[in-house]
Amino acid sequence: MAADIFAKFKKSMEVKFTQEYGSNKQAGGDITGKTEKFLRLGPEQDARKQEMIKAGKEIAEKRGIAFYNPMMHMGAPLGQRAITPYTISGTDIVAEPDDLHYVNNAAMQQMWDDIRRTCIVGLDMAHETLEKRLGKEVTPETINHYLETLNHAMPGAAVVQEMMVETHPALVDDCYVKIFTGDDELADEIDKQYVINVNKMFSEEQAAQIKASIGKTTWQAIHIPTIVSRTTDGAQTSRWAAMQIGMSFISAYAMCAGEAAVADLSFAAKHAALVSMGEMLPARRARGPNEPGGLSFGHLSDIVQTSRVSKDPAKIALEVVGAGCMLYDQIWLGSYMSGGVGFTQYATAAYTDDILDNNTYYDVDYINDKYNGAANLGTDNKVKATLDVVKDIATESTLYGIETYEKFPTALEDHFGGSQRATVLAAASGVACALATGNANAGLSGWYLSMYVHKEAWGRLGFFGFDLQDQCGATNVLSYQGDEGLPDELRGPNYPNYAMNVGHQGGYAGIAQAAHSGRGDAFTVNPLLKVCFADELMPFNFAEPRREFGRGAIREFMPAGERSLVIPAK
């Protein structure tokens, strides 16, 4: 496998640096060459830049105020850097650089939309209220009727009330509710259109793990309209859902809208039986639930679905790294901390041109050769998580990555910032240690050691302050204090020291996943999230995040929440 990935890495470098793209005159040359002439071709060398320049001029003329003009960039007239394409790792998709900015990529937007607009609400507490407080009978037939009512109401349609204004179905066609349960008998009694079938969506072994964890409980997977969460925020998701749940219970079970039991149903939907994707952030960061800063690394690992469809532990982890770098670096930190150009090329370093993949699969072979197949799928084959093991694997991984950069200067040119290289080297080391040990915090330890080895070798990691969390992070891998020593799976973007710097969080998420994909676990932290997103009806395919980003870049991805129905046609 490592040889195949190495060949793919070299092909990505050749596509990027030895083949002409647009009119960048990159044809010929050698990906191991150490010198290259700067041709100073300017932004016009690239087709997408030409399109953007043309659009900028037209918009400026139309609105009468200056707009996009790349010559305002002090470096653009020199045109020193060749504008080269990116190959999406794990695919053959070749993309324009600008098309990997999340603003220009509908798939990236939809990935976050699909997470932000989702919540999970238990049904059992509501059913107990109906039965014990109101004497109502709850049967598969009444549940089916309730779900039919709810799928009418959830997009924003009226029940119980008189003829109210409603949302147009064509604007909210991505909104729906399904249920799932660990009770096969109940699942068989519910109309199949409303059920996420655990036995169908997961392998037999994974389904058994999930059903054992969920037990006889029943849960609603709720996806409110994309257009609603885009207009409001992530905290609106549970409020919107709770309102429609309450109205649907009243209608389906012929309740009196003003009776006291309605308050219990409301409390269950809004609080007691609610599972949000992300936690609320503290006041200084001022974000409600279901915003990126509160989405833990373990939750993201469970949202990504590659583990359902692949038995390759490294690939499963790398898909989470890609999804995490896009979400945490491009959308969260890239807007919250930076804005504008953002941090796109921090993230692309981890999911393009197969550089991280090449390092990781080298590590897999190294581990399997030295530790008797410890990086293969399984639980009995793992090596004990000791400092000696972490030192060995992380050092070998980092040195291989450094040597690859030095052997292929094109890879250095691709990852032109030291902090990009730091991310990739450390992510490979951390994922490798987690795969070998089945222990995510051993993976974190490998990450931090990689940073030390990298800095010792090259003298720096990235821009000033980039390495702050990496210098102090090792002390907290096994700290007894809860806020410092959390398992990696429970950490997130707002964990102490993680909240300030780009280029880290996607790697931490991949490490969390690697510990469990290496073991073949059905989920990382929460089986409810794993099942909720095991649904082919969702616009974004969470089984292949990197490929979806590529489809977005080449403009093949169809998003939800568009407003074309209610705006003038161009």
UniProtKB/Swiss-Prot annotation:
Coenzyme F430 binds at Q161. Component of the methyl-coenzyme M reductase (MCR) I that catalyzes the reductive cleavage of methyl-coenzyme M (CoM-S-CH3 or 2-(methylthio)ethanesulfonate) using coenzyme B (CoB or 7-mercaptoheptanoylthreonine phosphate) as reductant which results in the production of methane and the mixed heterodisulfide of CoB and CoM (CoM-S-S-CoB). This is the final step in methanogenesis. Its EC number is 2.8.4.1. InterPro entries: Me_CoM_Rdtase_asu, Me_CoM_Rdtase_asu/bsu_C, Me_CoM_Rdtase_asu_C, Me_CoM_Rdtase_asu_N, Me_CoM_Rdtase_asu_N_sub1, Me_CoM_Rdtase_asu_N_sub2, Me_CoM_Rdtase_Fd-like_fold. MCR is a hexamer of two alpha, two beta, and two gamma chains, forming a dimer of heterotrimers. Coenzyme M binds at Y346, F464. It is found in: Cytoplasm. Pathway: One-carbon metabolism; methyl-coenzyme M reduction; methane from methyl-coenzyme M: step 1/1. GO terms for biological process: methanogenesis. The keyword Transferase applies. Coenzyme B binds at R239, K270, H271, R284. The modification 5-methylarginine is found at R285. Pfam families: MCR_alpha (PF02249), MCR_alpha_N (PF02745). Keywords: Cytoplasm, Metal-binding, Methanogenesis, Methylation, Nickel, Transferase. Is methylated on C5 of Arg-285 by the methyltransferase MA_4551. This post-translational methylation, despite being not essential in vivo, plays a role for the stability and structural integrity of MCR. This is Methyl-coenzyme M reductase subunit alpha. The gene is mcrA. The keyword Metal-binding applies. Its cofactor is coenzyme F430. It catalyses: coenzyme B + methyl-coenzyme M = methane + coenzyme M-coenzyme B heterodisulfide. GO terms for cellular component: cytoplasm. Coiled coil: none annotated.
